[in-house]
Amino acid sequence: MPIAIIGAMEEEVNLLRNELSERKDTVIANYHFYEGLLNSVPVVILKSGIGKVNAAIGTTLLLDHFKPSSVINTGSAGGFRAGLKVGDVVVSTEVRHHDVDVTAFGYEYGQVPGMPAAYTADPKLIATAEAVIERMDAIRVVHGLIVTGDSFIHDTERSNLIKTNFPDVAAVEMEAAPIAQVCHQFDVPFVVTRSISDSADEEASLSFDEFLEIASINSAKMVMEVVRTLADSE
């Protein structure tokens, strides 16, 4: 079974896609999938599009059609943890929705009814990422909580609200939680690796445009090393 790699934007999948050998392109319901060998390892790459619904639909099609052994979600994110800089990579320990509120009925903030409050990344995939970290001196990598919502966070008020609800948050983005939720439903292990493109503040949009390429390159490098290490361990 292939390893699945999901990125929302062209910039987030382009480097990985260009590294594929024996490439085969498939379009299902306007979602683009790219099969091939990445460093001799079978993979399938999905360009999901931006946002939670796009990510959920694309991931469902991916898992149902291609039957991957595991899922790696890559791309960019806004940095929340103190000390995080543009280009640093956050590896998920768990993923949550930051824009779901059904607390009136006894659920945790961010919890979708009938679903877990948090989606825990696969221990083997986290351990693999840790092994990769030791070999990547040029890229700073940290672990932590990644939260997801259907908004690009670019103001202090919303940043502070997220920090209030999730004090341990490391990064914020727009696709990881639905990807993790679909993986949970299909019982497929996942991990999220996101490179910091901005600080989720008033300068976020300018920073994102300027540093998206750096963030995408660093996240892609991390994914390629994780894929190689997973293959070597089997």
From Swiss-Prot:
Active-site residues, record numbering mapped to chain: 12, 198
Highest taxon, organism lineage: Bacteria
Matches recorded under Pfam families: PNP_UDP_1 (PF01048)
GO biological process, one term: L-methionine salvage from methylthioadenosine
EC numbers on record: 3.2.2.9
Catalytic activity entry: S-adenosyl-L-homocysteine + H2O = S-(5-deoxy-D-ribos-5-yl)-L-homocysteine + adenine; S-methyl-5'-thioadenosine + H2O = 5-(methylsulfanyl)-D-ribose + adenine; 5'-deoxyadenosine + H2O = 5-deoxy-D-ribose + adenine
GO CC terms: cytosol
Pathway, per record: Amino-acid biosynthesis; L-methionine biosynthesis via salvage pathway; S-methyl-5-thio-alpha-D-ribose 1-phosphate from S-methyl-5'-thioadenosine (hydrolase route): step 1/2
Keywords: Amino-acid biosynthesis, Hydrolase, Methionine biosynthesis
UniProt cross-references to InterPro entries, sorted A to Z: MTA_SAH_Nsdase, Nucleoside_phosphorylase_d, Nucleoside_phosphorylase_sf
Molecular function, one GO term: methylthioadenosine nucleosidase activity
Binding site for substrate: 78, 153, 174-175
Family named by the database record: Belongs to the PNP/UDP phosphorylase family. MtnN subfamily.
Biological role: Catalyzes the irreversible cleavage of the glycosidic bond in both 5'-methylthioadenosine (MTA) and S-adenosylhomocysteine (SAH/AdoHcy) to adenine and the corresponding thioribose, 5'-methylthioribose and S-ribosylhomocysteine, respectively. Also cleaves 5'-deoxyadenosine, a toxic by-product of radical S-adenosylmethionine (SAM) enzymes, into 5-deoxyribose and adenine.
NCBIfam families reported for this sequence: MTA_SAH-Nsdase (TIGR01704), PRK05584.1 (NF004079)
Name the record gives this protein: 5'-methylthioadenosine/S-adenosylhomocysteine nucleosidase
Species for this entry: Exiguobacterium sibiricum (strain DSM 17290 / CCUG 55495 / CIP 109462 / JCM 13490 / 255-15)
Gene: mtnN
